[in-house]
Amino acid sequence: MPAVPIRFGHARLGYRWTRYFGWSVRKLHVRGAADALAGLGHLGIRSAVDTALRPDTRSCNICGWSGSRFYPNVGPGYYEREASCPRCSCIHRYRTLAIVLGMASDFFSPEKSVIEVAPVRSFQAYCLWRKEGRNYLSFDLERFAMEPGDLTAMRYADNACDYFLCYHVLEHVPADVQALAEIFRVLRPGGTAILQVPIDWSLTDTVEYGRPNERETGHVRRYSDTGFGARIMAAGFELLKLRPSDLIDDSLIARHGLSTEPIYFARKPLSVSAARRL
């Protein structure tokens, strides 16, 4: 686990749920207010009872926490019952990502260069620990990243990195085709982009909203599985879709509260024609 523990998970979760409760009340969103209150309840009496009476059946592979249950992850348009680590607030999809990348790639090798857009603090700290503080860089419009940057107009040179991590970001980006083209550009030939977005499995085609949807945390579209895959391949990538259950035992999935959402590995071909890059 990281040498420096990631702290204040309770405080960050409480702040997030309190803000979501206030937003829901202002928007007269009854279900959202109820979900936020349920999340806050896990920080109070229920958390103390769980700690005292229940065995350690769950553990976080990011920070080393162990306990009886994970906390809910709530926000506009979603309520995930057991998702957030009580200590570091890392959610299930990043715990899953850490295991999958460790098993299926050399992403965490200190020799491999990684660029991540829109990092979360817990996973960023974990990456820096695993990579011995080397060859990891993050950027975003928000303050938690290592430097500011725009996914649709990155300042990095062509062929700059071995891996590019873009997790639950493209659904917020109006020009997602341009963003994928930029990711393709900065990856070295043979490099891989690790991508994930919320998928609506009932859709056959991606739905564009035309503007940010407040009830979906500002998403500008709803992807279908085939639609997302088609956009990745249209950018020039070779696509491998990997389900965590293909690699990880059911008992480990339960222990670490892992996500079952597929992860999209988009590989830049070793030989790339100039026309394909435009």
Please report, for each region that a protein language model flagged, where it lies by residue:
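Conserved N-terminal segment of class I S-adenosyl-L-methionine
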Residues: V4-A157, R243, D250-L278
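S-adenosyl-L-methionine-dependent methyltransferase catalytic module, highlighting the catalytic core
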Residues: I45-R58, I62, P174-I183, R188, ...
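Aromatic-residue hotspot detector
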Residues: S68-Y71, C161, P212, A235-F237
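Hydrophobic beta-strand segment of the Class I
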Residues: Y156, C161-L165
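Short catalytic micro-motifs in class I SAM-dependent methyltransferases
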Residues: Y167-H172
